[in-house]
Design a protein with these regions (language model features):
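Low-complexity, acidic/polar, glycine-enriched regions of mature
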Residues: 21-199
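Bacterial N-terminal signal peptides that target proteins for export
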Residues: 1-9
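Bacterial N-terminal signal peptides
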Residues: 9-17
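Extreme N-terminus of proteins, especially the signal/transit-peptide cleavage junction
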Residues: 3, 18-22
Length: 199
């Protein structure tokens, strides 16, 4: 074996542990939830969910800061349980789902937080506008096997955005002061993931 071949072989051997430490996981929409809440009339919160979404998480257990996440949400799948309100939220006054049928999050940076949590910084694209947001992520669970042989992990995350930053500016003033809809939206994710099969 020539000297050059030995160097190449050694390099591949050193790279193998790093490659093995990264794994790909698909978000399971049947056991996950993408929700939001916003203040209504300054007195209570209206909560809702997006029922259709996909996501891929690349977890690097050797160096968690090298992990990545991408989530795609179908805005027409929005529901709050009240049809008339849902129709208004899907209209041009708010999400304009016909014009902007998807909302996406693409991570750019992952950093460690306290007690095993993470802060995931990324680009959120909503209503045709892209802004940087930070997800506060709970510790990712250990692996668990389901009865059908799938390997699963889970986590949860939250972030807050100002809807006006994304062009969602519709509102009505109240006679008693304040506005009908709050500006701050809390987005919450309950995520269960299935490990992708090796190709």
């Amino acid at each position: 074996m020539s000297h050059s071949i030995r160097i190449i072989a050694l390099s591949l051997m050193l790279a193998l542990p790093t490659l093995a430490s990264a794994s790909t996981w698909n978000i399971d929409p049947d056991h996950s939830q993408v929700g939001f809440k916003v203040k209504h009339m300054m007195v209570s919160n209206v909560k809702g969910n997006f029922e259709k979404y996909t996501g891929v998480v690349e977890i690097n257990d050797k160096d968690i800061t090298k992990s990545k996440v991408t989530v795609n949400i179908e805005t027409p799948s929005l529901t709050t349980g009240v049809q008339k309100r849902d129709e208004h939220l899907k209209s041009a006054d708010f999400f304009a789902v016909t014009t902007y049928p998807t909302m996406t999050f693409v991570s750019k940076k992952v950093s460690k937080a306290g007690k095993g949590g993470l802060k995931v910084t990324g680009d959120l694209t909503l209503h045709g506008i892209t802004k940087e947001v930070v997800l506060n992520v709970e510790p990712i669970s250990k692996e668990s096997k389901d009865p059908w042989g799938n390997t699963r992990r889970g986590t949860a995350a939250t972030t807050k955005i100002d809807r006006k930053d994304f062009g969602l500016t519709w509102n009505k003033g109240l006679e008693t002061g304040g506005v009908l809809v709050g500006d701050e939206i809390t987005i919450s994710l309950e995520i269960e993931m299935i490990r992708a099969q090796a190709k």
